[in-house]
Amino acid sequence: MGTGRRKRAVAQVKLVAGEGKLIINGKPGFDYLHNNATAILSIQGPFQLFKLQKKFDTIVKVHGGGLSAQADAIKLGVARALCEINTSHRPVLKSNGYLTRDARIVERKKAGLKKARKAPQFSKR
């Protein structure tokens, strides 16, 4: 079991011995991600390091954020779950950046501004 987060997306990933199925919120992964090749490859990245694509079924519950953020949250959750299964995977995953949580989040809106940084038009007179 591994938890991954990215922006507002939170993914709970469970790895079960199987044949490589990806199930996200009860749907096949390809359907849930609208056959987005980038997102699917991103999720499979940690498995490809150790040639484990066909060894585990991945069952995911994910909510919040958009598809890209959800895919990145799932990727982090998969990497953390692989570390729980075998601790010797940790240094390799860490050196390839799969265990790093992307801390970039939306900057808050400030009072007196239109958005986080966008100011109303300045008039000298």
From Swiss-Prot:
Provenance organism: Oltmannsiellopsis viridis
Entry similarity comment: Belongs to the universal ribosomal protein uS9 family.
UniProt keyword terms in alphabetical order: Chloroplast, Plastid, Ribonucleoprotein, Ribosomal protein
MF (Gene Ontology): RNA binding; structural constituent of ribosome
Subcellular location: Plastid, Chloroplast
InterPro entries, alphabetized: Ribosomal_Su5_D2-typ_SF (IPR020568), Ribosomal_uS9 (IPR000754), Ribosomal_uS9_bac/plastid (IPR023035), Ribosomal_uS9_CS (IPR020574), Ribsml_uS5_D2-typ_fold_subgr (IPR014721)
One GO cellular component, as annotated: small ribosomal subunit
NCBIfam families for this protein: PRK00132.1
HAMAP family per record: Ribosomal_uS9_B
GO BP field: translation
Pfam annotation, one family: Ribosomal_S9
NAD listed as a keyword: no
Protein name per UniProt: Small ribosomal subunit protein uS9c
